[in-house]
């Protein structure tokens, strides 16, 4: 009976350890997705409005350019 209890306890510990490793792997993966990697930092999007845009632009807004990088946008 004592052997059965020890085997059951060991099996339970192994199962809990495997479950903890799986949770840690998921947490590490989620943290890696949230942090911008080296390849993401160089990515930027740029938008320009042509002179014949569908919406009429004021004289000061013609040729206005928006550059968006990860986290913020700025007008040029």
Swiss-Prot record:
Disulfide bonds join 68-73. BTD-1, BTD-3, BTD-4 and BTD-7 have antimicrobial activity against the Gram-negative bacterium E.coli ML35, the Gram-positive bacterium S.aureus 502a, and the fungus C.albicans 16820. BTD-3 is more effective against E.coli than BTD-1, BTD-4 and BTD-7. This is Theta defensin subunit A. Keywords: Antibiotic, Antimicrobial, Defensin, Disulfide bond, Fungicide, Signal. Forms a cyclic peptide with subunit B (BTD-1), subunit A (BTD-3), subunit C (BTD-4), or subunit D (BTD-7). An additional intersubunit disulfide bond is formed. It comes from Papio anubis (Olive baboon). InterPro entries: Alpha-defensin, Alpha-defensin_N. SMART domains: Defensin_propep (SM01418). There is a cross-link at residue 65 (Cyclopeptide (Arg-Cys) (interchain with C-73 in subunit D)). One of its GO terms (biological process) is cellular response to lipopolysaccharide. BTD-1 is a cyclic heterodimer composed of subunits A and B; disulfide-linked. BTD-3 is a cyclic homodimer composed of two subunits A; disulfide-linked. BTD-4 is a cyclic heterodimer composed of subunits A and C; disulfide-linked. BTD-7 is a cyclic heterodimer composed of subunits A and D; disulfide-linked. It comes from the Eukaryota. There is a cross-link at residue 73 (Cyclopeptide (Cys-Arg) (interchain with R-65 in subunit C)). Residues 23-64, 74-76 form a propeptide. Residues 25-45 are annotated as: Disordered. Residues 1-22 form the signal peptide. Residues 30-44 have a biased composition (Low complexity). There is a cross-link at residue 65 (Cyclopeptide (Arg-Cys) (interchain with C-73 in subunit B)). There is a cross-link at residue 73 (Cyclopeptide (Cys-Arg) (interchain with R-65 in subunit A)).
